[in-house]
């Protein structure tokens, strides 16, 4: 700062003496330099436009007002042009040159010593309006001169140019050196008495006319920022002179008045002087992309070179004639007075990942019509200023540049010019080193020492022709230029615009290859990335790595990641973007000691953290939820308001600089003799909140480990350390002193925990010694035990820990007893995937279960069945005690029929089942024989068979009810004999009407549901006896019950009691589809054909109960999340869904009649995926792989055991999920094969697995739909029938009913409605022959006559139950003797017929009871056939 101030004042005094007109400019530059010391200061370019002075950029601007582009007016002598503000800290005046591999030719003075005599700028009366195009902010040094924008110009026409300071140098504090000042007397002696001009703070700018377009986009590169005092070796500079050849190709000249800018390949400089007429000028940014490779005569450089130079000092004058073998170009424009030409230069682009702001070039171009161009070829003898600067710094001639950006405009693209331009430069490849070109444009020396004064009205073409006529070489150059431009357009490759279809195809191919990991362009980087992910998965799930094998894997991953990090081209350091965080001591090899049970070692690290900026760990979903709940609790709990501020995120920092144990990784090479950056000793000495590295003595270590400990304690260079670091815990502190014992032994490897090591090896195969492998695993416990007693740290005892905690209370440090770790868990999210699919599937499963419990309730809890009894109104218009059986649910969830209704896996709802179809067909055949049973007292009617209508507890007479059946003698409408139907008649239905050709058939099972009935029945209610079935009140309607769509006609009360689906709009069971009601979901496309194949997927989101869901969530949180962190969301979803699909499809084929829910097959596929990765990827790298395999196999056995419980998937489905998950993992995960990896092998494996899955799934679907009965002979149901709780009945068995009368006390039996009601036993049973237990439920017991005494009726003991409950087994055993005799009676069909129709015959069937020999009377209707099935 002192040097800057001294230089500033000295320059002001020099300027005041040399040029009195520039005093005002120097004072304003001084104030501007002082103001720019602030951090967020916005540089302003002040333009002093006086009537009697010649500014640098405007040679003939008259006095007056300066008008900005936005219309903002400025007073004279005080106009300001605002530039874009600096976004970063500006310390340009501090004189701290940063280190850089770029050429050390940045802060040099560029001047052109012209032999032209000085001439003052003429002053015109016009007031030109100059439009200025504002671009990047100027990174300046020194003073800001009035009206200066890149070049300082003295009165004698000599121009000065000084390179701007790099913005990134403001954050490089590695080197602090005193700035050196150069005596101004020596400078003036060298300059020959030329008055100095104040240098500007930015680069040269181009001043163009308003009609000239600006096609160029500014190219970012790293501008001048390194002074000559910093002796930094230049990379990749060849100390050989360049070949003697022409460095520039031909010049292309165009006379078009509408001029464009030259290409970025050649930076063109020109000098301009404005005419008397007020013409507008314009700024344009000239990117620094090329520098001329020139090295010619060095004779005349001499004393003009400067030995030392600082940021605050002025730039000296230095002559730089054009190269001898090349051609220089001078442009002289006509004006009232001329100014000296301006020379522009560009700096080499900085290599690496650091970015820099561009310094803008300014070139003065006069308006068209008032300027004349002149070109000449010279062979001067001079020196190369650029090469001389490099030689002065490094002693090596620079021929190439390390790296640099490519011009945004193609070099070979011809651009029309209004002035001569440099063209024909060879196009550079992106990977090659580029050299920024420096074009020196000089004015032609006037003959006789005078200036060339061209009249304003002269013609440019005439002057150009005269110049060409006098110079033959210029004619040859012009001819070659025109020929080159004509030939340049023809062979130029055209950019073919691909069609949208081709672009989409290319994108899909590239995306697919990247998804499978077989993209050749990114194979190396992807391999290193996946290797790191595999290691982290192995440590999380499988255990620790073996020490030696881990070292080799670390080296392989390190090299790949280094290459990948270097290819990104982004700045990996947080310092340039975070000015509040200072670079800190490199903590490689430093250890951290902790005590207690919270010690945790994980010998791995993440290279992305080392190569990139420090990004702290993302908060998990669970933590955010807990934090939200905790915040709400503390908000409503006002009892502890003081501790409210402690509820904070434990991984946020509010420090202005990071502690010393946080590593700052740099892309630059580190010196081999030390790891500390220069200038940070003061920060480390003043560190009070964190311990400095402590020394450890190895004398207390055991004898067998002393050598190892001493060897590990030796200091190692930072560049050679690629050790494996472990977690650093922030909250574990020892409260013995006022410093926290965070760090110990900067270079020792004998402490508890090592920080993350630097792995910035520049070669993938470089051998480095990891920290964790320098000490054997056997000797580490002994060294840890002795470390707590032998380590000595510098601690103070003046400030207590409690007081320190109070001081640090405002900082966002972790709370006590909360571990914060950097290098392990914080870095997993850098390259690993977030388990979004795990979060999503868990959320869906929880929501589905909650909604199912809310809508359907919870079934009886337990194993087995439960009986429910109640009194309901039945079709006989009497109260009956109905017993209903329900299956219990072990998992605390809905019933099985509700699960099927919500989308459980159930084969009957997915395809047409043969057995269900047979039972439905049988039911419809019996329904054709039914008719309307009308009560004679007009109490109602119901559709029933003749037996049910005649036998209702009384003798078969017509006094109670009439069974109205159409016959040939008494036919229905249209001669129909099928019917009648209660409440349904084609004659009285208007919609749909029975008219030709849509007449209703003579089959009541094919009649539709009538949506509209006419009023004929009410008018002729007592006159027309044929409409009695239409005027009666219909008591019973179809009710769908059971799991297989059983239908019976009953009352609404009874249907609600058994939780069935009541259809009041229908009259017959054939009019509805009970299976469609039971299955739910989307209706069938065809009513008779189930097609809900999507149940194979919907069942994955369903659970049988709360316990089932808890088990699933635990599995998915522990294993599915880890797998998703490795392979990503899409691959995890494919493995999860396809494994579940395969398992459910296999179970549906083998066990079709059992509802199953849950993702058991998917979990099996996930576990199988982990097993495959363990066996084929991590087996030889793990320390104890057998233990990890045993744990995973134990989990598989747990899943198989869960599959034996009710509502769970069969074990064959689990096996299918295991096979599918294993194959999908090997095909989807990149760089995973069964043998040594190869790209062609991987592609073949992918195709093999994909084709295998397609073939297997197709075969299984064909088997499931086309040949569903192939596996019916395999009794998979009976295999686990006892454990699953499924026996030979379902919840549809509710037969035993007791008729209760309030007048008389008696009981009687009602016949089962088996004629049109099929039972679940018929579907599940494998054979036609009934067991003795099943026979009881299907025997039609004869009805006993009324007894005179209720006591006598109660003495009769026989089975009156039609169910199979266990509490009725004693009654069945007592009546086993009667059942054996009943078998003999009903073994053959019995037909009773009578000539007299409508007459009843009574047949007495006697059977002797073992106790009371009671007689049983059976009343069987005539014309009725009874078969014992």
Swiss-Prot record:
Specifically expressed in the nervous system and in brain. It is a multi-pass membrane protein. It is found in: Endoplasmic reticulum membrane. Pfam families: Rhomboid. Its main location: endoplasmic reticulum. Residues 564-573, 740-763 have a biased composition (Polar residues). GO terms for biological process: negative regulation of epidermal growth factor receptor signaling pathway; positive regulation of circadian sleep/wake cycle, wakefulness; protein transport; regulation of epidermal growth factor receptor signaling pathway; regulation of protein secretion. This is Inactive rhomboid protein 1. It comes from Drosophila melanogaster (Fruit fly).
């Amino acid at each position: 700062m002192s040097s800057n101030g001294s230089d500033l004042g000295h320059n002001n005094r020099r300027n005041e003496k040399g040029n009195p007109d520039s005093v005002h400019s120097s004072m304003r530059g001084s104030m501007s330099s002082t103001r720019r010391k602030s951090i967020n200061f916005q540089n302003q370019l002040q333009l002093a436009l006086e009537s009697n002075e010649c500014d640098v950029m405007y040679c003939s601007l008259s006095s007056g007002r300066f008008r900005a582009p936005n219309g903002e007016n400025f007073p004279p002598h005080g106009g300001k042009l605002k530039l874009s503000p600096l976004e970063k800290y500006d310390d340009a005046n501090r004189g701290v040159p940063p280190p850089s591999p770029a050429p050390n030719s940045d802060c040099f003075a560029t001047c052109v010593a012209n032999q032209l005599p000085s001439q003052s700028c003429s002053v015109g009366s016009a007031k030109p309006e100059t439009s200025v195009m504002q671009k990047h902010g100027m990174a300046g040094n020194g003073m800001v001169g009035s009206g200066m924008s890149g070049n300082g110009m003295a009165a004698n026409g000599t121009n000065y140019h000084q390179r701007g300071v790099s913005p990134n140098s403001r954050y490089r504090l590695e080197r602090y050196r005193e700035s050196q000042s150069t005596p101004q007397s020596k400078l003036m002696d060298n300059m020959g008495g030329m008055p100095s001009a104040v240098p500007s703070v930015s680069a040269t700018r181009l001043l163009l006319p308003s009609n000239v377009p600006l096609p160029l986009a500014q190219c970012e590169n790293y501008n001048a920022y390194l002074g000559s005092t910093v002796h930094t070796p230049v990379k990749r500079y060849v100390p050989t002179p360049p070949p003697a050849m022409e460095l520039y190709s031909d010049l292309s000249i165009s006379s078009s008045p509408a001029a464009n800018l030259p290409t970025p390949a050649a930076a063109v400089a020109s000098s301009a002087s404005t005419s008397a007429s007020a013409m507008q000028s314009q700024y344009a940014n000239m990117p620094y992309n090329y520098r001329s490779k020139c090295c010619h005569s060095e004779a005349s450089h001499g004393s003009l070179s400067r030995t030392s130079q600082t940021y605050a000092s002025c730039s000296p004058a230095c002559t730089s004639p054009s190269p001898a073998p090349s051609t220089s170009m001078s442009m002289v424009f006509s004006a009232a007075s001329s100014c000296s030409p301006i020379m522009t230069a560009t700096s080499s682009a900085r290599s690496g990942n650091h970015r820099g702001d561009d310094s803008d070039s300014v070139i003065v171009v006069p308006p068209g019509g008032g300027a004349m161009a002149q070109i000449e070829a010279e062979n001067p003898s001079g020196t190369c200023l650029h090469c001389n600067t490099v030689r002065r710094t490094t002693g090596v001639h620079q021929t190439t540049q390390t790296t640099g950006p490519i011009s945004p405009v193609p070099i070979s693209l011809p651009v029309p010019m209004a002035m001569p331009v440099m063209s024909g430069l060879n196009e550079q490849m992106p990977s090659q080193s580029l050299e920024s070109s420096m074009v020196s444009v000089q004015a032609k020396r006037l003959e006789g020492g005078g200036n060339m004064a061209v009249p304003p009205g002269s013609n440019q073409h005439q002057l150009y022709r005269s110049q060409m006529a006098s110079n033959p070489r210029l004619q040859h150059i012009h001819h070659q230029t025109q020929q080159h431009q004509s030939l340049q357009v023809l062979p130029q490759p055209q950019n073919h615009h691909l069609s949208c279809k081709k672009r989409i195809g290319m994108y899909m191919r590239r995306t697919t290859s990247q998804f499978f990991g077989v993209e050749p362009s990114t194979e190396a980087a992807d391999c290193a990335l996946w290797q790191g992910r595999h290691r982290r998965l192995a440590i999380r799930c499988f255990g620790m790595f073996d020490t030696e094998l881990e070292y080799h894997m670390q080296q392989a991953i390190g090299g790949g990641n280094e290459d990948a990090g270097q290819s990104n081209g982004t700045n990996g350091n947080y310092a340039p973007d975070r000015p509040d965080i200072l670079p800190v001591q490199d903590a490689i090899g430093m250890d951290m000691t902790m005590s207690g049970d919270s010690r945790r070692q994980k010998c791995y690290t993440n290279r992305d953290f080392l190569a990139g900026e420090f990004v702290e760990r993302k908060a998990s979903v669970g933590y955010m939820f807990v934090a939200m709940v905790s915040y709400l609790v503390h908000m409503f709990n006002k009892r502890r308001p003081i501790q409210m501020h402690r509820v904070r995120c434990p991984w946020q920092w509010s420090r202005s600089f990071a502690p010393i144990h946080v590593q700052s990784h740099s892309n630059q090479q580190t010196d081999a003799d030390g790891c500390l950056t220069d200038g940070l000793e003061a920060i480390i000495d003043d560190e009070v909140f964190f311990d400095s590295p402590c020394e450890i003595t190895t004398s207390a270590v055991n004898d067998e480990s002393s050598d190892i400990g001493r060897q590990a304690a030796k200091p190692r260079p930072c560049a050679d350390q690629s050790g494996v670091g472990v977690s650093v815990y922030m909250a574990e502190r020892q409260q013995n002193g006022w410093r926290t014992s965070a760090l110990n032994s900067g270079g020792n490897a004998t402490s508890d925990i090592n920080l993350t090591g630097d792995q910035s090896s520049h070669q993938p195969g470089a051998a480095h010694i990891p920290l964790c492998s320098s000490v054997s695993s056997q000797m580490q416990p002994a060294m840890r035990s002795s470390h707590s007693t032998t380590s000595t740290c510098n601690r103070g005892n003046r400030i207590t820990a409690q007081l320190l905690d109070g001081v640090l209370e405002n900082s966002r440090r972790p709370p006590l007893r909360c571990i914060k770790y950097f290098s392990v868990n914080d870095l997993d999210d850098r390259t690993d995937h977030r388990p979004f699919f795990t979060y999503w599937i868990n959320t869906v499963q929880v929501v589905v279960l909650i909604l199912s419990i809310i809508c359907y309730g919870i079934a009886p809890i337990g194993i087995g069945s439960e009986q429910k009894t109640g009194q309901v109104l039945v079709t006989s218009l009497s109260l009956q005690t109905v017993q209903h059986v329900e299956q219990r649910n072990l998992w605390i969830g809905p019933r099985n029929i509700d699960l099927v209704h919500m989308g459980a896996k159930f084969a009957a709802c997915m395809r047409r089942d043969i057995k269900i179809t047979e039972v439905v067909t049988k039911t419809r055949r019996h329904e054709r024989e039914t008719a309307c049973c009308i009560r004679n007292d007009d109490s109602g009617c119901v559709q029933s068979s003749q037996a049910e209508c005649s036998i209702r507890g009384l003798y078969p007479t017509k006094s109670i009810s009439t069974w109205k059946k159409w016959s040939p003698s008494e036919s229905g409408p249209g001669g129909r004999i099928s019917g009648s139907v209660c409440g349904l008649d084609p004659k009285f239905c208007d919609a749909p009407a029975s008219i030709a050709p849509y007449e209703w058939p003579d089959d009541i099972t094919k009649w539709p549901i009538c949506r509209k009935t006419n009023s004929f029945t009410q008018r002729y209610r007592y006159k027309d006896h044929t409409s009695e079935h239409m005027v009666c009140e219909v008591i019973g309607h179809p009710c769908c019950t059971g799991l297989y769509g059983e239908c019976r006609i009953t009352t609404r009360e009874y249907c609600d009691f058994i939780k069935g689906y009541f259809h009041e709009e229908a009259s017959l069971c054939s009019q509805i589809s009970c299976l469609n009601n039971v299955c739910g979901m989307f209706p069938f496309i065809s009513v008779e054909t189930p097609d809900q194949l999507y149940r194979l997927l919907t069942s994955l989101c369903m659970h049988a109960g709360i316990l089932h869901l808890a088990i699933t969530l635990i599995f998915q949180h522990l294993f599915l999340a880890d797998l998703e962190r490795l392979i990503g969301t899409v691959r995890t979803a494919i493995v999860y869904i396809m494994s579940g699909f395969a398992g459910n499809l296999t179970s549906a084929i083998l066990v079709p009649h059992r509802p199953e829910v849950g993702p058991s097959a998917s979990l099996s596929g996930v576990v199988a995926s982990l097993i495959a990765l363990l066996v084929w990827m991590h087996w030889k790298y793990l320390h104890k792989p057998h233990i990890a395999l045993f744990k995973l196999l134990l989990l598989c056995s747990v899943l198989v055991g869960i599959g034996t419980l009710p509502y769970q998937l069969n074990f064959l489905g689990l096996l299918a999920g295991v096979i599918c998950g294993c194959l999908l993992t090997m095909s989807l995960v990149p760089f995973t094969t069964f043998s040594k990896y190869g790209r062609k092998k991987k592609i073949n494996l992918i195709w093999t697995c994909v084709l295998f899955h397609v073939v297997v799934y197709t075969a299984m679907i064909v088997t499931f739909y086309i040949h569903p009965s192939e596996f019916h002979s395999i009794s998979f149901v009976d295999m686990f029938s006892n454990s699953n709780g499924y026996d030979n009945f379902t919840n549809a068995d509710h037969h035993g009913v007791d008729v209760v009368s309030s007048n008389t006390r008696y009981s009687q039996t009602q016949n089962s409605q088996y004629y049109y009601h099929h039972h679940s036993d018929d579907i599940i049973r494998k054979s036609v022959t009934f067991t003795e237990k099943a026979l009881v439920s299907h025997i039609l017991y004869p009805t006993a006559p009324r007894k005179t005494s209720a006591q006598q009726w109660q003495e009769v003991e026989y089975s009156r139950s039609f169910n199979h409950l266990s509490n009725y087994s004693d009654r069945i055993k007592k009546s086993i003797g009667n059942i054996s005799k009943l078998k003999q009676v009903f073994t053959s069909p019995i037909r009773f017929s009578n000539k007299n129709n409508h007459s009843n015959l009574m047949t007495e069937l006697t059977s002797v009871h073992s106790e009371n020999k009671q007689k049983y009377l059976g009343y069987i209707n005539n014309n009725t056939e009874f078969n014992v099935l």
